[in-house]
């Protein structure tokens, strides 16, 4: 059982890596090392995997699969995935298998994280970190139920495919009769991990700064941004874990989004409140930012003279992919840190998933070498969401949003 002991020691490290292993939160040298942990956790031995599959699916590996690769494609903190092919089928599938005993280990790590959060709140960092760890506890708790994950994957797949002529991202199809709490079988999507994109570009002899390379990167970011704008602002139900290990780049710069263990279903009040904050950030409107904070239930206490401008800067630091002028990296311990200037006394637990998602998108944009504002890109979706909720008049919409609505009416879609 030495593999289980090794896993116990590494679980906390992997959690930390996935939280801070982004270019805007840590030096690049750290990031290069931390991101390797996204899908390289210790693997469960194959004989144990076979026992889990037999118990969960009721048949042995040989009875179900034509072939089954013993070496996993990747192993993360909760599960590992294997490539396989079902008997009588010509298409490959991915089999996700939960590590035995991992739930108890992970929840122990979370409790330790909560104790650390309570300690940190006694320092100069006046941020409601404990609420954040409570949301992490809830979200990670959901990840141990693969039936829930399969339902989430199907719901998001249906939403994106039905609301777009072509879905901005690929979502694997679930094999519904091969899902249990600990095993999930889904469609195999061929692609390269986004972490290997730079190597793939170099292998093809393409200059990373060339027009063709930058166009490919822009298309990748455009796809991710559109998908997340629609999920968060239009649906409220979204994939909440877009770290590099969950993103594949497919033929033609198409993007596949994997692993739906962490999803979030925002209540309409928070979805529309965040839509209002998106418009405030896109317009650099400090008064609207302050109003949005109150609507979202973010309780702040400012320790600076220029309160409204600092609140705007704080919002853009937390909830936009483009950092405001003068902010290069989040540095909570520096003397001029925004977290020290603005004490966050209350922060809605459910909003943490939005914050984390935006920060992961920011890390993606920095890694691709593209500085952009998701708030500006999401403006049309936010305006439409508020309009449909009766909170904006047609005359308040930007011209491109009015034009999109006109097209939908002509096509009979509303």
For every predicted segment, state its role.
Residues 234-244:
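Catalytic-loop of the protein kinase fold
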Residues 1-231, 236, 250-254, 260-268, ...:
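Broad phosphate/nucleotide-binding scaffolds in NTP-utilizing and phosphate-metabolizing enzymes
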Residues 245-249:
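Hydrophobic residue at the +6 position relative to the catalytic HRD Asp in the kinase catalytic loop
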Residues 274-276:
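Short amphipathic alpha-helical recognition elements used for nucleic-acid or partner binding
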Residues 281-285:
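Short helix-adjacent coil turns
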């Amino acid at each position: 059982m030495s593999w289980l002991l090794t896993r116990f020691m590494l679980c906390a490290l992997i959690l930390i890596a996935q939280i801070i292993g982004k270019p805007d939160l840590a030096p690049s040298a750290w990031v290069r090392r931390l991101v390797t942990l996204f899908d390289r956790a210790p693997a469960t031995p194959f004989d144990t995997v076979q026992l889990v599959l037999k118990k969960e699916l009721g048949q042995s590996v040989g009875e179900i699969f034509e072939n089954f690769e013993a070496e996993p494609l990747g192993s993360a903190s909760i599960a590992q995935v294997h490539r396989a092919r079902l008997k009588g089928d010509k298409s490959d599938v991915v089999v996700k298998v939960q590590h035995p005993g991992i739930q108890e280990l992970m929840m122990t790590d979370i409790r330790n994280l909560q104790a650390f959060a309570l300690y940190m709140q006694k320092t100069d960092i006046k941020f409601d970190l404990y609420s954040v760890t409570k949301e992490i506890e809830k979200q990670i708790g959901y990840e141990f139920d693969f039936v829930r994950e399969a339902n989430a994957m199907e719901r998001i797949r249906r939403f994106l495919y039905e609301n777009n002529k072509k879905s901005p991202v690929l979502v694997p199809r679930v094999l519904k009769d091969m899902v249990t709490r600990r095993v999930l079988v889904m469609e195999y999507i061929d692609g390269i991990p986004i972490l290997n994109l730079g190597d793939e570009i170099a292998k093809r002899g393409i200059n990373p700064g060339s027009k063709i390379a930058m166009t490919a990167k822009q298309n990748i970011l455009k796809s991710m941004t559109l998908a997340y704008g629609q999920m968060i602002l239009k649906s409220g139900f979204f994939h909440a874990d877009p770290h590099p290990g969950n993103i594949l780049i497919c033929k033609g710069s198409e993007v596949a989004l994997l692993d739906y263990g962490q999803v979030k279903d925002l209540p309409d009040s928070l979805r529309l409140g965040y839509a209002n904050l998106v418009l405030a950030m896109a317009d650099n409107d400090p008064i609207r930012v302050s109003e949005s904070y109150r609507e979202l239930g973010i309780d702040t206490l400012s320790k600076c003279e220029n309160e409204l401008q600092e609140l705007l800067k704080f919002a853009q630091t937390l909830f936009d992919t483009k950092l405001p002028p003068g902010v290069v990296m989040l540095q909570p311990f520096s003397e001029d840190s925004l977290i020290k200037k603005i004490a966050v006394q209350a922060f809605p637990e459910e909003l943490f998933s939005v914050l984390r998602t935006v920060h992961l998108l920011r890390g993606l944009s920095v890694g691709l070498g593209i500085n952009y504002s998701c708030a500006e890109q999401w403006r049309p979706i936010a305006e439409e969401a508020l309009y449909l909720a009766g909170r904006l008049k047609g005359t308040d919409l930007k011209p491109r949003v009015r034009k999109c609505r006109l097209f939908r009416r002509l096509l009979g879609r509303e």
